[in-house]
Amino acid sequence: MNLTLKVWRQKNATSRGHLTTYRVKEISPDMSFLEMLDVLNERLILDGDDPIAFDHDCREGICGMCGLVINGVPHGEQRATTTCQLHMRHFKDGDTIVIEPWRAAPFPVVKDLVVDRSAFDRIIEAGGYVSVPTGSAPDAHAVPVPKASADTAFDAATCIGCGACVAACPNGSASLFTAAKITHLGLLPQGQPERARRARAMVETADELGFGGCTNIGECTAVCPKGIPLATIARMNADYLGLAATGD
Amino acid sequence: MSTEFYRTGAPIEDGKAPDGVIAERWDNRRFAAKLVNPANKRKLTVIVVGTGLAGGSAAATLAELGYDVKSFCYQDSPRRAHSIAAQGGINAAKNYRGDGDSVHRLFYDTVKGGDFRSRESNVYRLAQVSVEIIDQCVAQGVPFAREYGGLLDTRSFGGAQVSRTFYARGQTGQQLLLGAYQAMARQIQAGKIEMHPRTEMLDLILVDGRARGVVTRDLVTGEVRNHFADAVVLASGGYGNVFFLSTNAKGCNVTAIWRAHRKGALFANPCYTQIHPTCIPVSGDHQSKLTLMSESLRNDGRVWVPLTGGDTRAPADIPEAERDYYLERIYPSFGNLVPRDIASRAAKNVCDEGRGVGPGGLGVYLDFADAIARLGRDAVAAKYGNLFEMYERITGEDPFETPMRIYPAVHYTMGGLWVDYDLQATIPGLFVIGEANFSDHGANRLGASALMQGLADGYFVLPNTIGDYLAAGPFEPLDDAHPEVADAAEAVRTRVAKLLAVNGSRTPDSFHRELGRIMWDYCGMERTDAGLRKAVGLIQALREEFWRDVLVSGESEELNQQLEKAGRIADFFELAELMCIDALHRTESCGGHFRGESQTPDGEALRDDETFSYVAAWEYTGDRPVLHREHLTFEYVKPSQRSYK
Amino acid sequence: MIDRGAATAPVQAPDQGAGRARTERTTATKGSRATTRYRGAVGKKAVMAVTGALMIGFLVLHMIGNLKVFAGRDSFNDYAAWLRTVGEPMLPPSGFLWIQRIGLLVILALHITAAVQLTVQAKRARPVKYHVKRRVQQSYASRTMRWGGVIIAAFVVYHILDLTVGVANPAGTAADPYTRLVADFQRWYLVVAYAVPLLLLGLHLRHGVWSAAQSLGRGGTARERPIKLFATGFAVVLVAGFLLAPVGVLVGVVK
Ligand SMILES: Cc1cc2nc3c(=O)[nH]c(=O)nc-3n(C[C@H](O)[C@H](O)[C@H](O)COP(=O)(O)OP(=O)(O)OC[C@H]3O[C@@H](n4cnc5c(N)ncnc54)[C@H](O)[C@@H]3O)c2cc1C
Ligand code: HEM
Ligand code: HEM
Ligand code: SF4
Ligand code: F3S
Ligand code: FES
């Protein structure tokens, strides 16, 4: 199939960007979205143009490195799918596709479609861990964890840190990402001693980094490739406010 | 042949390997190792390249011990290292099930699984430490699967006869890596780790023969910079991407260890490559990488191809009598659960016979119809739902309706830099951990053992052994002006400039694809003398063309993904040649290395313990590599021919 | 704010690192627990939720009080008078009303302040807009919270001038409450002037009630649907209850 792409091009963080139109031909429906961009890039190089920079690594939906806003939706319209897993069979011949980078002040554009998401690392560094030195752990069976808690903690722990939640949120809020980690650790017995401190430090760090606040709009969970539920945000709020969370 | 492709040097020995009763060796070594005074640890700096399971766990633990750590990764966050993609699980000899597992059995299985090409002492230590890994990870909050009683669940994996594999749904690597990443985050916050994401190591700095630092390129600004330390740890992962198509992440590369190899570190067993049988087949020329489908699918799926070649009917239209369930036919006792290398080769054989299915005839069916009929659709969905979904996303076909198509793909590289029992390479002060070293797995790795090894190295082994070396430090302070430092940095700048200056007519990817094709055809699942000789010639010619005709767009002082690629490919060329030479010299079949000339009458791999019971450690010379042999002895596990019939 | 290249800049030098600075910040936060909490977006949202809930409480009582118009002129006027005498002699005349007015003003001020601060924070977080932005699942109600709130506030000002003070009322300041009310709603355009903000209020609460539960950590995957259903039901009942009086007047049930 043949497609028209409008791609955000920006030489570096300080220069002004703009949308540039490209036409790509003979795209196979079996290609992934990124493979389609590979094809375009190969052509751009041979034409002496600068290929489009975009982040990616695992190309199987787990590393969280890829992420493009495709026709206005982070990771594209297919639900629970990362950009690298999105395949061209979901597009039609003749379609126009607009491709933009994540937009948020704490995610400055580095080049073209590449943004700097290190703010997420700062949030985890603020407290997204259990302080346990190596080698001092009790036997793994010393503390049983009810299956239900373990499973819910796991659901939250599957966050890949891609940042689509921020990109989608009209407030540019990192709440879903932050809440996913707070929920993961807060539900396990191992995470209890630091639970209150963790929530406070992580939430405040997110604010300081310039993310917006959550007004419970729910776009984040809709685009989240791992379907992290809004319940995690409720749990984060409860932990932050020092209230006992209810529900799962 | 020796003179044609390589030379033979003096044999080497693992000087740090303790002797005595195997179960006490690790204790003995730890006791014999020198300790570093706590006050001195603050004055010592360690560089850790890589933030995967191995590098992440090592950096966190070293920082905790008090060393100053500098960490590097090429991704935008340490959390994205390729370990994140591991699906199946991690082995540990916990024997929580009481099904007869023990440290000794894990040791035994690993030595046997490695086809008797690994060191007994190392493997025993790995099995011992495995137990502590699970404790450590659980304490960090890694959400392993649990049973209703709240205790950890385990499963049997990769044909093991005991249930020793701990898992976190199909995302074990992710959860373990996040555990290590969080431990790192804690140390970054505490100011003990200086993290450098989007920074690639491009050379090793040697001063007076010791590893004293790395030269890096900042992938955003292009700045080439020196970083100094008292010891350097490489944890840069595997090099399966030399095949272009593999299950590895796109950025996986050999650069870090290859640069160290060029500076004198021996490279061991480069040819041992694990080909995983259950991957989604290539769908066209555009294919950029291959996706693994967890091995656990073979527990319930049945593998088959049409009985006769050229059968293009839809799978549902092929009657039972005209199907060949070839694994069940050839290996009646293990059936669909034969080890990876056997399943992979069998698939290749039926496809070579022209009986493969799907585009290009490179695929076999993995059929769940029986399982669905037997267990019900819901039960199958509960077990494999996420994998089916992943398959559906990629292929657009629903495995509930039509059989999956699978084909083998390059997955893991057992080879890597040679290290001694302390995980130190032949360059003093250079330590290598995780998939980047060659240790522990011999000629073939068992499922769920790579995660175990990475974490064993990083959390428990290296932090103990590196002290023995560092006790002699701190070493003299260095600066950019030091002649050996300046030379290293200059070499990096020159190389970057050279890549950009070629300005030819072919893209880096086109070279990489072609190189991968050569490797897959001649150094892939089956290797022959003639094929390997041909491959060496082809690789040399292609490499020469690369340096004459590659077109790297852009400049060096910016984010330039083509430049990154080109640099990695340049190193892959050199590695590829060494892999072929290693494969050529090893005229036996063992583990992940199958030589067409060395098989039993019924087509199974035939080892030659008499001649090849050694680690092949190669020295870089710039011309023909020099082979150093480290002989292997087996006191506890008697080498035997594997049989899965 | 993060500047360019932060991803590659060394996170910190080991001795004067940002990591250290951050640790200090989190351990050395000054001020009482409540004020520290309020600094974060989550704290602001909690304030909005609590103030919102209090305002909802007022509206429920107000709505029920309004239904007295159906009991006749005297009953309604008595009720209005009672509001001014309740609590006497413990409270001065209209004491209760003034307490309520001050209370509501403070509550509204807090609610609006937090709303404005959150809006500013959100605008700063997304300085560059998308060229194309598609909504995936956000509701109309959730998107109209800010403008809806402003319109509701404007309405309240008008409403007080109309029915409490009387200057904006067709019947004027001298008329009794019942007369003013009837004077209003005999005019269809004033019914519309009330109905529109009321519908917006309904939307505000449809999202607000669920949102408040979420903000206070009362959400949960299993509860999301029930709470949302309740919120919708509640908003419908409240708006309908308020609309009874104007519609009653318009169709002539109340004269
Ligand atoms: C799809 C898949 C599934 C797997 N499933 C399993 C499983 O179920 N069980 C199991 O035991 N094993 C599994 N494995 C194998 C296992 O995941 C890997 O062997 C293991 O994770 C390697 O860890 P590592 O820490 O050595 O390296 P990696 O995780 O690969 O990390 C390498 C690190 O080095 C950095 N790096 C690399 N080069 C440079 C450079 N030049 N400069 C700076 N930094 C650099 C990278 O940024 C990265 O941080 C699987 C592998 C794959 C591909
Ligand atoms: C000037 C007037 C008002 C403004 C500007 C305003 C604005 C807002 C905003 C921006 C929100 C947050 C949006 C969200 O949660 O998605 C909100 C929430 C809310 N508002 Fe209002 N509002 C106003 C008046 C009112 C009134 C009169 C009521 C009560 C009846 C009310 C009840 C609520 C409730 C219950 C919430 C939910 C709180 C939460 O999400 O935590 N608001 N309002
Ligand atoms: C049709 C709907 C409504 C009717 C008929 C109505 C009627 C009245 C009347 C008659 C009064 C004057 C009472 C008195 O002075 O004794 C009043 C006061 C008031 N109403 Fe309403 N009202 C309606 C809707 C609303 C709404 C939607 C709000 C808020 C969002 C609101 C907020 C107030 C306030 C704040 C006062 C002032 C109370 C005081 O004097 O302190 N009303 N209303
Ligand atoms: S919560 Fe979802 S969208 Fe946000 S970073 Fe995690 S995986 Fe991505
Ligand atoms: S979209 Fe934004 S407002 Fe909250 S619920 Fe999600 S973070
Ligand atoms: S590239 Fe790893 S998630 Fe898309």
Show the residue positions of the predicted features:
Chain A
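Short, structured protein-protein interaction patches enriched in aromatics and acidic/basic residues
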Residues: 53-65
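Glycine-rich phosphate/adenylate-binding loop and adjacent beta-alpha elements
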Residues: 70-92, 99
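Short, contiguous acidic and Ser/Thr-rich linear segments
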Residues: 20-32
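Short strand-turn-strand beta-turns centered on an Asx-Gly dipeptide
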Residues: 8, 24-25, 70-72
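Ferredoxin-type iron-sulfur electron-transfer modules in oxidoreductases and energy-metabolism complexes
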Residues: 31-50, 95-248
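Eukaryote-biased recognition of intrinsically disordered, low-complexity regulatory segments
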Residues: 1-22
